[in-house]
Amino acid sequence: MSANGWFQILLFLGLILAVTKPLGVFMARVFNRERTFLDPVLRPIERLIYRCTAVDESQEMKWTEYAIAMLLFSAVSMLMLYIMQRVQLHLPFNPQKFGAVDPAHLAFNTAASFTTNTNWQAYSGEAVMSYFTQMAGLAYHNFMSAAVGIAIAIAFIRGIARRQSETIGNFWVDMTRAVLWVLLPFCIMGALALVSQGVVQNLKPYDTVKLVEPQQVTTTGADGKSSTQTITTQTIAQGPVASQEIIKEWGTNGGGFFNANSSHPYENPTPLSNLIEMFSIFAISAGLTYTLGRMTGSQRHGWAVWGAMAALFLVGVSVVYWAEASGNPLLAGVDQHTSAMQAGGNMEGKEVRFGIANTALFATITTDASCGAINGWHDSFTPLGGMVPLVNIMLSEVIFGGVGAGMYGMLIYIVLAVFIAGLMVGRTPEYLGKKIEAYDVKMAMLVALIFPLIILVFSAISSVKTFGTGSILNPGPHGLSEILYAFVSGTGNNGSAFGGLTVNTPWYDVAIGIAMLGGRFLMIIPMLAIAGNLAKKKYVPASAGTFPVTTPLFSVLLIGTIIIIGALTFFPALSLGPILEHLQMHAGKAF
C-alpha cells in the first residue's frame, strides 16, 4: 500500500461527497415536478412523449398499478431484445455480418440480463453483437432498466413521505423523467469526456493490422496431432463505444462493449477516464440519499444513511487494497514490494496503467453498486481480495448501490433496523412518523429471504450436479467460489464474474437468467407493497420513546443490521469458499 493509493481513494470519496447535495436536490426537484434549468428544453419533449403514448401525467397509480406497469414494460422490453438478437443478421449496422445470437438459451440469458440491469455477459461482445444490437438493444436497456430502478426508489420515498394517500406516483412519468432529466444530459457530457480520453465512437468495420512481430501458435486437434500456425495479423474491434460506456457506468449497468470490459483500452484508456467511470457509478446513488432526506423532510436522516454507506465502503476498499497489495505468499521468488517502478503486490489480472489501488477501488465500487463493470480480473484476486466483492453483492448492494436499487434495498434494511430498535425499547417502531407494523416487516423479511434462497438453491444444485461442476476451471474451494459468485452476481443484478467458470451452457444460461429475473422482480414487488402501505398511514409525531434515525447511533444500528442479515446468512458458504482458500494458500496450496 502507498500514500498515493490512499490519496486516490480518499479523493474519490471526496468527489462523491461533493456531488451528493447538488445532485440530490436536482433529483428531488425533478420528481417533485418542480422547475429545473433543463425544463425549457425537456418539458416539450416530455409532453410530446406523453401525447404519442397516451399517458396522462396527472393520473397517479396505486402500488399494484405501479407494479403491473413496471412488469409489463419490462416483459415487453425483454421480448423485443430477445427477438432483436435472433434476427440480428437481417438488421442494419452489422459490418462484420454477425449471425443470430445462438443458441437460444444465450439470447434468453442476455435479454434477462439487460432487462434487469444485471448485464451479465456469457458472450464476448465484439465477437457476437452487431452495432445495431449494441445500440438499439443493449444501450437502450441500459437506459430503461436504470430508469426503472430510479422510479421504484422514488416511489418508495414517496410512500414514506405521503400521508393517508392511496397512490405513490405514476410509473410512466417517473421513468420518463428519469431518462430525460437524470440519465441523458449527464451521459451526453460524460460520453464527450470519454471520447476526449481516447474512447472510440464510430461505426467503422473492424480494422485488420499487421503485427510488428509475428507469433507462432501451436494447437492440438481432435485426433491428438499438433500443428503450428504463424499469426501475422490482428483484428482490432471498433464501434460506438463511448455512448454505451457512459450509460454502462452512470446507470450502474456494467455490461462491456468488449469482453475485457473497462480494462480494455478502447473502453477505459487513461487514469482520468477510470476516475470518470468510477465517479459515474456512485453519483446517482449517493445523490438519492440527499433526495431521500429532502423529500421526507429529514435531511439529517439522509446524511445518516450516507454515513452508513460510506463507512461500509471504506472498510471494503481497505480490505481489498490491503489483500492485493500484500501479494501472494506462494510467489516468494517474485518481487512484490511497492517501489517507484512497480505497484507491488498481486498484479495478476490487473492493468499496469491503473495499478493495485485503482483496481481495488474499482472492484469495490462496482460490487457495492449493482454495476458489474471491471477494470481488472476478480478471479485473479487473492482469496480475501476476491471475497470482498462477493460479500458486497451478498449485502444486496446497498453500499450506495445501483441507481435506485441501492436506495430501495437500503430502505428495506432501515425498516428492519427500526423494527429491531422498537423491540429493544418495547414499543411499536416508527420511521419518519410512520408506524412500522406487522405487514411492513413481513414484506421486508420476504425481500431479505428471497435473495439468499435463490442464490443458495441454485449454487447447491450446481455444486453437486455434473452439468454444474463440469464448467469449473479451478477445483476445490475456488471452484465453489466461482459458482457462488455467478449466482450471487446474477441474483444481485450485478453482472461481474469470476471468469474461470464456463457459463455459456444450457444450465447456467437458464439458471442464471431465472436468478436475475427473480432477484429483480420478486424483490421489487414486496418493496412497492411496503411503499403503498406506508403511504396510507397517518403521521405520528415523535415522542420521547421514538428511536431517532438522524444520529450516528442509528447509522451503527443500520450497519449492524446489514451485516447480521446480509453477511451472516452466507457465512457457511464463504467458509467453504474464499475463507478456506485463504487458509490453504498460507499453508502452501494453490488451486
UniProtKB/Swiss-Prot annotation:
InterPro entries: KdpA (IPR004623)
Keyword Iron included in the entry's annotation: no
GO molecular function: P-type potassium transmembrane transporter activity; potassium ion binding
Membrane topology: Multi-pass membrane protein
One CC-aspect GO term: plasma membrane
Compartment(s) where it occurs, according to its Swiss-Prot or TrEMBL record: Cell inner membrane
Disulphide bridges, residue numbers: none
Transmembrane segments: 6-26, 63-83, 137-157, 179-199, 272-292, 303-323, 405-425, 444-464, 510-530, 553-573
Superkingdom of origin: Bacteria
Keywords: Cell inner membrane, Cell membrane, Ion transport, Membrane, Potassium, Potassium transport, Transmembrane, Transmembrane helix, Transport
Family listed: Belongs to the KdpA family.
PANTHER family in UniProt: POTASSIUM-TRANSPORTING ATPASE A CHAIN, POTASSIUM-TRANSPORTING ATPASE POTASSIUM-BINDING SUBUNIT
Subunit structure, as described in the record: The system is composed of three essential subunits: KdpA, KdpB and KdpC.
The protein's role, per its UniProt record: Part of the high-affinity ATP-driven potassium transport (or Kdp) system, which catalyzes the hydrolysis of ATP coupled with the electrogenic transport of potassium into the cytoplasm. This subunit binds the periplasmic potassium ions and delivers the ions to the membrane domain of KdpB through an intramembrane tunnel.
Name assigned to this protein: Potassium-transporting ATPase potassium-binding subunit
